[in-house]
């Protein structure tokens, strides 16, 4: 299966408008944003676990990254409520489950072999955040030569300057609204822009965004 698989082309998906599609595991559903492959695939998706559901044990050959959007995600390493950011490096193995139910933004098979450390961060911890000025705050979640991942908070009424991303940029709207080059996007919107893209962010209500850069070029 190929969905938004050409990384040299821009892609925009309003995930809130997509139907949930059943996965091979009972109680686990997906909304696919990008995919290149079948069940073992390079993929970015929203995944929803019904209360009491679980996935079978599995190994992530090329890693897994996810942000908990709702509920509580659990595995052998702990319980992670909404706001937690997790990276499981290539070769890691776990058995995901959720007692109360959960929804996550997850990226699969997108890590190089050089990545070896697990990451567990609570993005709601004030100590992670720094003020960038001009109505922007940032929490750095991961930084390496191959990519940089942050949570970005925009104040109500924010109007930013145009920025160019030489190695591409990916955004997911977690809360609020964000206008990108004049088009307003709301929670669940996902955008991927190729290298050398230029964009301007603004927000009327304020916004919380997941942003990844440097990974597309």
Segments predicted by a language model, with ranges:
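A short, N-terminal "cap"/entry segment at the start of jelly-roll beta-barrel domains
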Residues: 1-39, 101-148
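Ligand-binding loop in jelly-roll beta-barrel domains
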Residues: 28, 79, 90-115, 184, ...
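Short histidine-centered beta-strand/loop micro-motifs
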Residues: 45-46, 56-60, 77-78, 96-97, ...
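Glycine- and acidic-residue-biased ligand/ion/polar-headgroup-sensing regions
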Residues: 50-51, 60-75, 165-181
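Histidine-centered metal-chelating micro-motifs
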Residues: 53-56, 74, 86-95, 159-160, ...
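Surface-exposed interaction/gating patches
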Residues: 123-126, 130-180
């Amino acid at each position: 299966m190929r969905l938004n698989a050409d990384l040299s082309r821009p892609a925009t998906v309003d995930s809130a408008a997509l139907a949930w599609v059943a996965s091979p595991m009972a109680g686990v559903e997906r909304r696919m944003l990008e995919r290149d492959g079948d069940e073992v695939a390079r993929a970015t998706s929203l995944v929803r676990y019904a209360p009491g559901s679980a996935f079978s044990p599995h190994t992530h050959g090329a890693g897994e990254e996810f942000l908990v959007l709702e509920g509580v995600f659990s595995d052998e390493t702990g319980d992670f409520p909404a706001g937690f950011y997790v990276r499981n490096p290539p070769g890691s193995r776990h058995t995901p489950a959720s007692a109360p139910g959960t929804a996550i933004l997850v990226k699969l098979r997108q890590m190089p072999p050089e990545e070896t450390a697990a990451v567990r961060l609570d993005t709601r911890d004030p100590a992670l955040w720094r003020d960038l000025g001009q109505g922007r705050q940032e929490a750095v979640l991961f930084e390496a030569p191959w990519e940089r991942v942050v949570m970005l908070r925009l104040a109500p009424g924010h109007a930013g300057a145009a920025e160019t991303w030489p190695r591409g940029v990916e955004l997911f709207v977690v809360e609020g609204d964000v206008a990108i080059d004049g088009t307003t996007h709301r929670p669940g919107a996902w955008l991927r822009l190729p290298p050398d893209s230029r964009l301007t962010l603004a927000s009327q209500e304020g916004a919380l965004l997941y942003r990844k850069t440097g990974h597309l070029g």
